[in-house]
A protein has these predicted regions:
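Conserved S/T- and glycine-rich ATP-binding loop of Class I adenylate-forming
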Residues: 63, 80, 172, 178-181, ...
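A short helix-loop-beta submotif of the ANL/AMP-binding
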Residues: 70-95, 107, 111-116, 208-209, ...
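Conserved AMP-binding/adenylate-forming core of the ANL superfamily
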Residues: 22-75, 95-103, 187-196
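Conserved AMP-binding/adenylation subdomain of ANL enzymes
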Residues: 196-209, 219-261, 272-281
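ATP-dependent adenylate-forming carboxylate-activation enzymes
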Residues: 25, 67, 88-107, 121-123, ...
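Conserved adenylate-forming
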Residues: 101, 110, 122-151, 241-297
Length: 297
């Protein structure tokens, strides 16, 4: 039988259904969206059911995930997996660097032969606005390609769908594309087995508590901060990269408040926090990071 990360999550949900799995925080550190193990899998099942009900996709089809920061992208990721589809996380083009990001998104959609795009209502509306303002049609970007794909806002997929047949799990969990900063983005196959084998090498303790502001379309954020903790029966508290830049003390406050055992960030983030005026002596004195066991960079 093909190993599946969902099999592990199903078992953990049976063992402690009411344990907190994911919580997303606002800029003040207050939770704005949360899921227990049981409620998360219920949502995943609902998304999978609606993807199956649409009848547009076959097992193994690739779906782009284009979401703003939040838990909806994580729900959609697992919903694809439950439905036997292959999620492809992408950076959602926004007003800053719009044309470059849009070019990469179109390239990825073509390269993986995406069958559709999952997103949120708000992001889809903002993308249309940015498209109208940017004049990308004159820049050689094939917008018609992604416009011709089915777009689905997964917030609407909340009710269970009865009668959905069990999907056959592919060995492929998802496709992770490189950033494309120096050349065209290239897709890397990530399997269920890859994640299951490497998880204990990165997080060596049970029930980890992870704090993350990392982008969820990035491998360090998605794998290290949302997949690994879930497979270890842990809890992830996430917040937006923008909120970290605006208020870096939020990272330290969250690690203190929730007794984080693990976190992750690239080198620039630590340099950013050390710059004069970013963090006051008084705010740091109130922090307690003694619970940390793993710090990835």
């Amino acid at each position: 039988m093909t190993p599946s990360i969902l099999g592990h999550l199903d078992r953990l949900a049976d063992e402690h259904p009411d344990k907190l799995l994911y919580s997303y925080l606002d800029v003040n550190g207050d939770p704005i969206e949360s899921y227990t193990y049981a409620s998360f899998l219920q949502r995943v099942e609902a998304i999978a059911g609606h993807l199956w009900k649409e009848g547009r996709f076959a097992g193994g089809d690739r779906l782009l995930l284009a979401y703003p920061p939040g838990l909806e992208m994580i729900c959609a990721f697992f919903g694809c997996v439950r439905a036997g589809l292959i999620p492809v996380p992408v950076y959602p083009p926004s007003s800053r660097g719009f044309q470059s990001a849009l070019y990469k998104m179109v390239h990825i959609a073509k390269d993986c032969q995406a069958a559709g795009i999952l997103t949120s209502r708000d992001y889809q509306a903002s993308l249309k606005t940015n498209l109208a303002r940017s004049g990308v049609s004159a820049c050689g970007i094939d917008v018609d390609y992604i416009s011709g794909l089915p777009w689905m806002a997964t917030e609407e997929f909340v009710t269970p769908i009865a009668g959905r047949p069990a999907a056959a799990h592919s060995k492929v969990l998802f496709l992770q594309y490189t950033s494309g900063s120096t050349m065209e983005p290239k897709g890397v196959i990530v399997t269920h087995e890859n994640i299951l084998d490497t998880c204990p090498l990165v997080i060596d303790h049970s029930s980890p508590v992870v704090i993350s502001w990392l982008p969820q379309y990035h491998d360090m954020g998605l794998i290290g901060c949302y997949l690994y903790p879930a497979l270890k029966g842990g809890t992830t508290y996430g917040f937006s990269p923008t909120d970290f830049i605006q208020r870096p003390i939020l990272w330290f406050d969250a690690m203190t408040a929730y007794r984080a055992t693990a976190t992750a960030a690239p080198n620039f983030a630590y340099d950013y926090c050390l710059r004069a005026g970013r963090l006051s002596k008084e705010s740091l004195e109130a922090c307690d990071l003694s619970s940390l066991r793993v710090l990835m960079c």
